[in-house]
Amino acid sequence: MKMNLPDLAYTIMMNDKADKLLIKWKDTVILVGTPNDVFWMAQSCLVVTTIKYANRVYIINVEIEERVDGI
């Protein structure tokens, strides 16, 4: 099952499991922020591929999911 980035950020935010999320796409950091920041700023087309956790920081790799409707 694919999970998009805003959904994951919301889950982490509700469980109070992290202080920071570091979001990477193709080995490039594209966003660093609190789970709340990421929830409001991230796009649903960003799909989580891998997750690493250390010291209340999640390192999340994402890919861009292209949509049929072009949006």
Predicted regions and their residues:
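N-terminal acidic leader/helix
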Residues: 2-26
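Acidic, low-complexity, intrinsically disordered interaction modules
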Residues: 17-64, 68
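Short intrinsically disordered terminal tails
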Residues: 1-3, 64-71
